[in-house]
Every structure is written in C-alpha cells, then in structure tokens.
C-alpha cells in the first residue's frame, strides 16, 4: 500500500514543472523525481573562509574567446531564468590543464520584497544580490549532452554581483535592454556583438574551487565549480530590471530563483589566495553589508505596501 501511494505521488509530480518554493515539485521535493538532488555532493554551498584550504598550485584560469565577439547569441526565457547560448569556441583551461567548452550563461537573483538577495553561493553566510553562471563541458566529450552524464563532464565559472550606488554598468546595457523581448516563458531573442569577459569581474585571477553539482534538476554531481573572488558591480536600476522583467510558466514574475545552500559533507574547498583579495572581513565591513541590506529591504517593503494600497483603492472604486 505504501509503495502504491509513493508511486502515485511521484507520478503526479512527473506532470509538474519543478519550482523553487511553490507547487508539488518545489525544492524540498526535487529528490523524489530527481534522485541526484538528494546526494551528498550538492551545490551551492556556503564558502566559510576559515575552512577554505589554500592551494598555491592553483593557477589563474585561462579564458579563451571570451572577449568581444561578432555574431548572434540566442537569449531565452526558459521559465526559470534568462539563458544566453554561447559558442564552443569560448574555452576555459583550468590549473590542471583540463579544457572546458562554453555552453551557456544564466543568472540567479532575488527580488521578493522580503528577501532581495539572490546569489546561490554565500560567503560566510552572506548572500550577494545576483549570481552569474557560465556553464562549460569537458572538451574530451563530443557534446554537452554527452558530457552531462560523465563524472568529470562539467565545470561552472560563477561570479557574484554587488549593488550599491554604482553607476550603470554599460557592459550590461545590451543584455538588460533585451529582457523586455523575452518577458514570457519560452520566448527568445538574439543578442549581437557580445563581450562575455566584460560582463564578468575585472579580476579573474583569484577563485574558490570545489566539486559539486548542478544547482537545478537534475542536480548531477559532476560539476567542478570555480567561484571568482572578485565581484561584478551593477546599478540598482539594472538589478530591479532583471528582478522584475521576466515571467515564469504560470505568468508570475521570476524572483528568488536560487537554491538553498547544501551541506558540505566533508568536501574540501580550495582557493588560490590566502586572504580575500577584494574584501576585508572585519566587523566594520560586515556591519556595512548588513546595514546596506536593511536599507534595501526597507525600500522594497515601502514599494510593496504602496502597490497593495493602490490595488485596494482600485478594488474599492472599481469592484
């Protein structure tokens, strides 16, 4: 009887699209349909500075073909995020000589009035505003489809995004301006003359490295992660545009599309630097981080209340 009920539940879930926090197949239940999501080598994780192991043999990543490129780059709203397809001529060579070919680039963000930060990886428990993933597959495999099921098949270059009072990041202008063209899930457009390297942090020399998984179903545990220590800087206007432009398959705004951090389970996180080269972890810096988040949360709460008041006024006069 129990087995029958389990099969009925799994069968019902198979008819649903996976989500992060709502519905039958939310994050807590991914593992029922995608067993790897319940594995012991899952991503993302919290990068705890005191537990990161310094490895002086880790050299800087070598990125080839990431600069300004002529041509067309398909960009799609897949119902979970915005995804940019990349040519395999973009390559990343790691410290051990492994070469990975680029497949796609996508983003994770917050946006909900009660939680604005949306990075997947956190640093000492602190969540950044956005996280960028450039997904690659090992060059020894003929395609991404072949590599995605191999134990050493994938690598992801991740970058965290900060927002304060920065001016507009012009390297993102082309990307941001085309979000309105893919508002609905399933819609696609084309970006032209894209420079991926300029969309990444200015200093790519320093990074954290560990073995993990894809952060969305099927959560396969075959990903070598490289999380860059430096950050991308975007303006508040650019952040808000990304957070509020796209709709999912239920025509709801795509927000908080990030997975919770997963247990490290005795894995080792390495870095090719002794101390964080771009941020001092002092009491003052942490206080500034939290005060900045409180300020932004209050602004989102104000806007949320204004929207509710406006909606109630409309319902009162136009029943």
From Swiss-Prot:
Chief place where the protein resides: secreted
State the similarity comment: Belongs to the alpha-carbonic anhydrase family.
User: What are the EC numbers?
Assistant: 4.2.1.1
From which residue to which does any coiled coil extend?
none
PROSITE patterns the record matches: ALPHA_CA_1 (PS00162), ALPHA_CA_2 (PS51144)
Q: What is this protein called?
A: Carbonic anhydrase 6
Q: Which GO terms describe its molecular function?
A: carbonate dehydratase activity; zinc ion binding
Query: What does the function comment of this entry state?
Result: Reversible hydration of carbon dioxide. Its role in saliva is unknown.
**Enzyme class, one word?**
lyase
- Glyco sites are at 62, 251
* Alpha-carbonic anhydrase domain mapped to chain residues: 16-273
Binding locations of substrate? 215-216
Query: InterPro entries attached here?
Result: CA_dom (IPR001148), CA_dom_sf (IPR036398), Carbonic_anhydrase_a-class (IPR023561), Carbonic_anhydrase_a-class_CS (IPR018338)
Which cell locations does it reside in? Answer: Secreted
Q: Name one GO cellular component term.
A: extracellular space
Q: In which tissues is it expressed?
A: Major constituent of saliva.
**Substrates-to-products reaction catalysed:** hydrogencarbonate + H(+) = CO2 + H2O
Which cofactors does the annotated protein need, by name? Zn(2+)
Active-site annotation: 80 (proton donor/acceptor)
User: What UniProt keywords are attached to this protein's entry?
Assistant: Disulfide bond, Glycoprotein, Lyase, Metal-binding, Secreted, Signal, Zinc
Tell me which residues bind Zn(2+): 106, 108, 133
Q: By its UniProt entry, which Pfam families does this protein fall under?
A: Carb_anhydrase (PF00194)
Q: Which cysteines are joined by disulfide bonds?
A: 37-219
């Amino acid at each position: 009887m129990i087995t029958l009920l389990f099969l009925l539940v799994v069968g019902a879930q198979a008819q649903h699209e996976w989500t992060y926090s709502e519905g039958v197949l939310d994050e807590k239940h991914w593992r029922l349909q995608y067993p790897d999501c319940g594995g012991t080598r899952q991503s993302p994780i919290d990068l705890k500075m005191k537990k990161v192991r310094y490895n002086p043999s880790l050299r800087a990543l070598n990125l080839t073909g990431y600069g300004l490129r002529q041509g067309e780059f398909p960009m799609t709203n897949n119902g979970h995020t915005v995804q940019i397809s990349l040519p395999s001529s973009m390559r990343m060579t790691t410290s051990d000589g492994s070469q990975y070919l680029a497949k796609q680039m996508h983003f994770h963000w917050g946006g909900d009035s009660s939680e604005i930060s949306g990075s997947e990886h956190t640093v000492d428990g602190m969540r950044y505003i956005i996280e960028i993933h450039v997904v690659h597959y090992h060059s020894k495999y003929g395609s991404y489809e072949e590599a995605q099921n191999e134990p050493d098949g994938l690598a992801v270059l991740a970058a965290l995004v900060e927002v304060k009072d920065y001016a507009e990041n012009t390297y993102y202008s082309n990307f941001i301006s085309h979000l309105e063209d893919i508002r609905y899930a399933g819609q696609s457009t084309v970006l032209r003359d894209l420079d991926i390297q300029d969309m990444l942090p200015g200093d790519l020399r320093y990074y954290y490295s560990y073995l993990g998984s894809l952060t969305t179903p099927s959560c396969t545990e075959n990903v070598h992660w490289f999380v860059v220590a430096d950050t991308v800087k975007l303006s508040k206007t650019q952040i808000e545009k990304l957070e509020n432009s796209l709709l999912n398959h239920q025509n709801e705004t795509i927000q908080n599309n990030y997975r919770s951090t997963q247990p490290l389970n005795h894995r080792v996180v390495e870095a090719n630097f002794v101390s964080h080269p771009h941020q001092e972890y002092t009491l003052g810096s942490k206080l500034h981080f939290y005060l900045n988040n409180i300020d932004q949360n209050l602004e989102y709460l104000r806007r949320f209340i204004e929207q509710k008041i406006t909606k109630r006024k409309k319902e009162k006069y136009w029943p």
